[in-house]
């Protein structure tokens, strides 16, 4: 860990539309098995993760969180699954600052420079921004859509955990969406596992 950080979690549940999409996935899995082409667990998890990453009420919950934590929109990156989700998140962000940009494809250098020099407050971006980005002044990361791979989460968190020589007392913020469900079938161990290890990291303090 490079600098101290606060870990904020936003619990979310599936909407009726999300649940319908999950039922369709299990129906497709059953149909494939009947046809003699059973899915592997990886295929099933991948399909279910698409619903989790793009859960319908995430933009609304993000808006609710930002309304109580307006300062966190500044010096931040919002990681989303794709352009479709990104546009919904961007609409929420626009309610708190008009100094933001979106990045979904191409080269990120221009946007990274704008963020690092303070020309924009926030950047809504997809997974292409995971690696090779060094913005020492960056303070906040929003994990809107997070894959199961721990390495990807570490890379994303690393964007805001760099030591800033111009702000030696820097304390970053990691905001994460965690699935909460009463339905055992819909529970995602990946979210709970991620929450546990990030919480342990957040407890570490610099000496």
Describe these PLM feature segments:
Residues 79-104:
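Conserved helicase motor "Helicase C" RecA-like lobe of SF1/SF2 P-loop NTPases
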Residues 1-2, 68-71, 94, 114-118, ...:
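Conserved catalytic network of the ASCE P-loop NTPase/AAA+ motor domain
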Residues 22, 89-93, 132:
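Hydrophobic packing residues within well-ordered alpha-helices of enzyme cores
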Residues 60, 87, 91, 113, ...:
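Alpha-helical elements of the RecA-like P-loop NTPase motor core of helicases
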Residues 99-206:
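Conserved RecA-like P-loop NTPase helicase motor core
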Residues 75-77, 121-122:
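Residue-level preference for the first positions of well-ordered beta-strands
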Residues 1-73:
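Interdomain helical connector at the RecA1-RecA2 junction of SF1/SF2 helicase-like NTPases
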């Amino acid at each position: 860990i490079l600098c101290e950080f606060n870990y904020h979690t936003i619990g979310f549940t599936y909407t009726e539309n999300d649940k319908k999409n999950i039922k369709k996935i299990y129906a497709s899995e059953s149909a494939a098995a009947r046809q003699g082409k059973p899915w592997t667990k990886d295929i099933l998890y991948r399909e279910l993760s698409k619903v989790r990453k793009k859960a319908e009420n995430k933009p609304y919950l993000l808006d609710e969180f930002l309304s109580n934590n307006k300062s966190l929109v500044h010096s931040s990156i919002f990681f989303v699954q794709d352009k479709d989700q990104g546009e919904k998140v961007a609409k929420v962000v626009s309610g708190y600052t008009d100094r933001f940009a979106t990045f979904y494809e191409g080269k990120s250098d221009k946007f990274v420079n704008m963020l690092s020099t303070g020309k924009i407050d926030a950047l809504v971006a997809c997974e292409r921004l995971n690696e090779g980005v060094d913005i020492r002044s960056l303070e906040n990361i929003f994990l809107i859509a997070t894959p199961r791979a721990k390495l990807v989460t570490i890379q994303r968190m690393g964007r805001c955990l760099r030591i800033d020589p111009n702000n030696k007392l820097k304390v970053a913020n990691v905001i994460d969406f965690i699935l909460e469900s009463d339905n055992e079938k819909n529970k995602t161990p990946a979210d709970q596992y991620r929450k546990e290890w990030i919480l342990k990291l957040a407890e570490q303090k610099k000496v």
